[in-house]
């Protein structure tokens, strides 16, 4: 089944009511949190929402420092910096927080080569963010997270396939798989490799539309970026960019674009 589902994945460009081009992916690719609970206020102060003005929440992301947000490449392709803003400092999409302007979008030069690989990108804020109790950076991990580890997924993705999007940030603990188990349970080894991290708990728990680009955290460090899944929470693994694998790319890309 998974092999067939992945085969029909396609990228769609949709124009919002505000005539702003927004990149979305069909339901076989973008993700959200299913089976989670409302996150406590301030429990994920590194979590941001990438927003399209006039449209709203598009993807998640993680604040790495006062200027940079880590997200998925597919959240950035087709956009110019002026197309996006970054919401920080709130668990609610309806109130609180601060919307920040973006001045640079960067993603891996081999994004989607091969398909579903190198899905990682960076967003540079126009001005440094002001840190507070509700706005904090997260350290990105240099070490690979082990299999069978309990990790934390957060996001504003749909709470069921074709279901509603939550106003409040959702949180869910999930369990990592080895790449071997991920390929076995996913049904097609061509879509995951050493640059991926997979999670799976049970049917009814996982990522969904709107979670893309968001954080997966282990022992307080960022270990994954939401990439893809079978919508939604149907008992198949969810795929993430493995942050430890892309650690050097993240570090050098930020350093080379600091001015």
Swiss-Prot record:
Localization, UniProt: Secreted
GO MF term set: serine-type endopeptidase activity
Residue ranges of the propeptide: 18-32
Disulfide bonds: 59-75, 182-198, 208-232
InterPro entries: Peptidase_S1 (IPR050430), Peptidase_S1_PA (IPR009003), Peptidase_S1_PA_chymotrypsin (IPR043504), Peptidase_S1A (IPR001314), Trypsin_dom (IPR001254), TRYPSIN_HIS (IPR018114), TRYPSIN_SER (IPR033116)
Enzyme nomenclature, EC number: 3.4.21.1
Site (Required for specificity): 206
Keywords of this entry: Digestion, Disulfide bond, Hydrolase, Protease, Secreted, Serine protease, Signal, Zymogen
Gene Ontology CC: extracellular space
UniProt similarity note: Belongs to the peptidase S1 family.
Name of the protein in its database record: Chymotrypsin-1
Originating organism: Anopheles gambiae (African malaria mosquito)
